[in-house]
Every structure is written in C-alpha cells, then in structure tokens.
Amino acid sequence: MDLSKKSAENVAYMVEKIKEKLKVLNFDAIKPSHFSEEWYDELKDIYEMVMRKNTFSPSEMQAIAEELGNLRKK
C-alpha cells in the first residue's frame, strides 16, 4: 500500500490497521468515515507510531485515543 498518496482508501487502511494493533473493542467508535483526508498527515503520523510499537501502556492508549478524537470530522 502506497501511503504517500492522500486518499480515502489509505485513510480507511490506516484506521483499520490502528484498530487491529490497538485491539480496539468498540469498533464503531473508530470508523474510517470519521476521518477526513484533510488530516491525512497527522493520521499517518499516528499510524506510523502505532505500527512501530509492540505494546502500549494505558496512558499511551489514552493519548492515542485522544489524538484520534481530535482528528475526527466535526
């Protein structure tokens, strides 16, 4: 997947991979449709950070959830 190109498909891919890696239980809380390509670079930064780590502390999980919440479409 070429994540250097901003597209709705790439947004959906990154959101799904973040959910898988973080083992999100409430899948409806994070949907690709909640995110705009306007925030693509920020979402990609979160995606890359999540993919680099193997485990997350509760405070890291909270921080990631807050950042994703800040990027959601209003």
Swiss-Prot record:
Pfam families: DUF1128 (PF06569)
Family matches, as InterPro entries: UPF0435
Family affiliation: Belongs to the UPF0435 family.
Name of the protein this chain belongs to: UPF0435 protein GWCH70_0415
The organism of origin for this protein: Geobacillus sp. (strain WCH70)
